[in-house]
Regions:
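Catalytic-site microenvironment of enzymes
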Residues: 1-245
Length: 245
């Protein structure tokens, strides 16, 4: 006998699919933490065809703007891009539409621009505001005069409630996935240009301190970059699939 379509069943099935996908990703991430090799991690998921989330990934700096220079002389822009590309791969495998502000070592400015930094920031904001994104993740690395400072931290626009939720979810994942002893919390900021001039829920993820010898070394290792990308992906998917966007 053909079963009647009960109202709400399709919606419930979609929610179940999203939860199952999130659980599968979590299990894959847990297995990845204990893996020391460079294997490529894959998982199966049942895509929700009625809902495809759009995520903008913004690798900070690039081109003639190196960002911070690590204690090991590694420029921040290279670490940002490496983590961002890994994050892109993971989110795309989870059926997200990913828009990158840059995919090479190139700034978003023209050679003739008088102020290339301002031109770059304007271009990034245009990409984000035209994207209709459910979430925006800007990847950066921190630095401080004291070499002892360490730990990932997420920043959000002070007046953005959705940005705050996204930041708190990501901060929790970064602490549990990278360093349980990290006591930093998600922090509001009212000064960052891109946070003030974008419409979608946006956060700036400072993945670690390039001024700290230990973290600077880790952040240049592909396996650790992948681990950072997984934690950020896990938090991002938790945010969008939870209906916060």
């Amino acid at each position: 006998m053909k079963q009647k379509d009960i109202p709400g069943r399709r919606s419930m099935n979609n929610k179940i699919n999203r939860v199952m996908s999130f659980l599968i990703l979590g299990l894959a991430f847990a297995a990845m933490i204990f893996e020391t090799g460079n294997a490529v991690y894959t998982w199966s998921k049942q895509a929700d065809k009625e809902q495809r989330y759009t995520i903008v990934i913004d690798p900070g700096h690039g081109g003639n703007d190196p960002g911070k220079i690590g204690i090991n002389d590694v420029p921040e822009k290279d670490v940002n891009l490496a983590i961002s590309l890994k994050l892109k791969d993971i989110l795309e495998q989870n059926d997200c539409k990913v828009i990158m502000t840059r995919e090479t070592d190139q700034g978003l400015y023209q050679d003739g621009d008088t102020n290339k930094k301002i031109a770059d920031l304007h271009a990034r904001c245009r990409i984000i505001n035209d994207s209709g994104a459910d979430a925006v993740i800007s990847i950066h690395q921190n630095s401080f005069t004291s070499e002892s400072s360490k730990g990932a931290q997420v920043f959000y626009q002070t007046t953005s409630e959705k940005g705050k939720v996204l930041a708190e979810i990501l901060q929790e994942q970064l602490v549990s996935g990278l360093d349980p002893e990290n006591n930093r919390v998600a922090k509001a900021n009212s000064d960052y240009y891109m946070l003030k001039n974008t419409q979608a829920p946006m956060v700036i993820v400072e993945c670690g301190f390039l001024s700290n010898t230990q973290e600077a070394e880790l952040l240049t290792q592909e396996a650790y970059q992948r681990r950072v990308a997984w934690t950020v992906a896990l938090g991002t998917l938790q945010y969008v699939s939870g209906g916060h966007n």
